[in-house]
């Protein structure tokens, strides 16, 4: 087995390290009166060796039987001790801080039992959690925190914490939860202090996202309540300082730079809300969060009010942000439709505007998530109103704008838009199933509009034969295969078949009208 110092010496792939080694080679070459190795080749050789060693180090902990041997080596223990206690390893760049922390925590799977693994993690990160706690409690923190070396050190510690959090697994979950719990208050203090340091804010958010994502499924009810409360406080603090908002008074170049910078924060917040939502989908705890009166939907509701105004259609042009946003939106509407329905009119209209944008996106996955969102929205309203409740309430009703013109309700608008898409626009055939699932509850909610839209299509068809085919097809769409008005699995399947047959029958000649 290759000893740890071999890796420890070679994972430092900073330019300064490479430069000093290549200069040494060139000097030795001159002394021996031989041609020095070309500068570019020397640098490439050292970087390649360093990257190879770095990748090998990370790969060693993928198999448990290798980890069992690793943790028994003095050299591995020396590496772990150096990571926990020596300042020299803070010379590594941020990505390597995170990766090395993740690698060392993964190696804990080779220890004899869960208690030993948890103690190993505590030994690795205890000093760093203590450091953040002591730093955050300093009386002169505001001035000390702005020193470049302190900013760098805080950034390194945050990345190490993120690496540990991302390595969470059942065996080490307890220690990693305790680690995150111990730095909750320091994290909030640092967010306050570094509110104008966008790079530090981003690192801080990414740690919280990784920690919540790795922990949420395993937390008991009282622990979940603590985490949800922490996330609420984090969101409130983020919102109170207007972090993430972009001034429209900026020049075009600065505005573009600000958008690029802030979209990272928004992605992190979206991921945080998604992780919290997952508790209701995947939960390995022994008790229900309801026993503690924890309402995740409340923090999600608050988070939506913070995030949605910041997400413009321009920002949705960033593919990763766009994907995360619609993934969260579809998940929220499927799990907490009542929370979205409670949004104020401005926030709700903004959400619907982004949905309309997503329906006409080039990425089929984005369109699919929007269709799932529409299905959840329409089915929620239909079931609620069928039981005598308000459902989406005023959001679903038509209204007059400031000019006195009647504006359609949101379900009417999307029924019209979805039929237009299915009959006249280009899309992937793979989306027909998801489109059917969204169209079915929309038709049930707006049966009068469906009839009017059908009549409009019929009146525009001059050919008697084609008109007859269209009449029959429109009727079959909502009645064939014993389709009923119950939103259950069998009826969704029946409607999928009906829509497939409907499109085969009429889409061809309708597009030539």
Give each language-model segment a name:
Residues 1, 5-7, 16, 28-62, ...:
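Extended HEAT/HEAT-like alpha-solenoid repeat tracts in very large eukaryotic scaffold/adaptor proteins
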Residues 1-38, 70-91, 117-142, 173-194, ...:
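Amphipathic alpha-helical segments within extended alpha-helical solenoids and repeat-rich scaffolds
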Residues 63-68, 112-116, 170-172, 215-219, ...:
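Alpha-solenoid ARM/HEAT helical repeat scaffolds used for protein-protein interactions
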Residues 64, 111, 165-168, 215, ...:
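Long alpha-helical scaffolds in large eukaryotic adaptor/regulatory proteins
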Residues 240, 330, 334-338, 360, ...:
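Short amphipathic alpha-helices and their capping/turn residues within compact interaction modules
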Residues 280-294:
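Compositionally biased, intrinsically disordered low-complexity regions enriched for acidic
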Residues 384-390:
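Short, flexible/disordered intra-domain loops and linkers
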Residues 407-513:
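Extended, C-terminal alpha-helical/coiled-coil scaffolding tails that mediate protein-protein interactions
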């Amino acid at each position: 087995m290759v000893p740890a110092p071999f890796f420890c010496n070679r994972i430092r792939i900073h330019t300064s390290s490479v430069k000093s080694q290549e200069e040494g080679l060139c000097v030795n070459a001159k002394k021996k009166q031989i041609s020095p190795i070309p500068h570019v080749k020397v640098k490439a050789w050292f970087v390649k060796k360093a990257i190879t060693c770095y990748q090998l180090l990370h790969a060693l902990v993928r198999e448990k039987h290798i980890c069992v041997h690793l943790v028994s080596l003095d050299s591995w223990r020396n590496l772990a001790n150096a990571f926990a206690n020596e300042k020299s390893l803070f010379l590594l760049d941020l990505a390597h801080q995170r990766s090395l922390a993740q690698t060392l925590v993964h190696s804990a799977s080779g220890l004899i039992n869960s208690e030993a693994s948890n103690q190993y993690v505590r030994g690795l990160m205890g000093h760093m959690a203590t450091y953040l706690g002591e730093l955050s409690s300093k009386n002169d923190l505001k001035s000390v925190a702005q020193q470049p070396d302190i900013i760098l050190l805080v950034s390194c510690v945050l990345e190490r914490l993120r690496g540990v959090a991302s390595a969470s697994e059942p065996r080490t979950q307890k220690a990693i939860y305790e680690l995150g719990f111990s730095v909750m208050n320091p994290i909030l203090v640092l967010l306050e202090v570094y509110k104008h340091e966008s790079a530090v804010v981003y690192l801080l958010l990414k740690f919280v996202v990784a920690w919540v994502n790795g922990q949420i499924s395993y937390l008991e009810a009282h622990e979940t309540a603590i985490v949800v409360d922490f996330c609420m406080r984090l969101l409130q603090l983020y919102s109170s300082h207007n972090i993430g908002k972009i001034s429209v008074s900026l020049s075009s170049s600065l505005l573009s730079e600000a958008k690029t910078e802030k979209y990272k924060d928004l992605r992190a917040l979206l991921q945080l809300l998604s992780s919290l939502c997952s508790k209701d989908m995947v939960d390995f705890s022994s008790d229900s969060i309801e026993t503690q009166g924890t309402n995740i939907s409340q923090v999600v509701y608050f988070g939506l009010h913070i995030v949605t105004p910041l997400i413009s259609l321009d920002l949705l042009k960033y593919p990763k942000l766009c994907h995360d946003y619609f993934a969260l939106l579809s998940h929220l509407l499927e799990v907490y439709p009542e929370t979205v329905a409670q949004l104020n009119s401005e926030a709700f209209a903004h959400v619907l505007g982004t949905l309309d944008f997503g329906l006409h996106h080039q990425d089929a996955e984005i369109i699919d998530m929007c269709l799932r969102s529409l299905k959840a929205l329409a089915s929620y309203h239909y079931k609620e109103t069928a039981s005598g409740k308000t459902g989406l309430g005023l959001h679903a009703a038509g209204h007059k704008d400031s000019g006195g013109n009647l504006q359609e309700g949101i379900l009417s608008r999307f029924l019209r838009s979805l039929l237009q898409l299915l009959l006249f626009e280009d899309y992937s055939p793979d989306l027909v199933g998801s489109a059917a699932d969204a169209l079915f509850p929309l038709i049930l909610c707006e049966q009068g509009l469906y009839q009017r839209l059908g009549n409009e299509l019929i009146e525009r068809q001059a050919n008697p034969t084609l008109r007859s085919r269209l009449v029959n097809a429109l009727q079959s769409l909502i009645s064939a295969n014993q389709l009923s008005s119950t939103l259950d699995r069998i009826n969704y399947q029946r409607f999928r078949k009906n829509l497939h047959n409907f499109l085969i029958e009429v889409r061809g000649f309708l597009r030539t009208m």
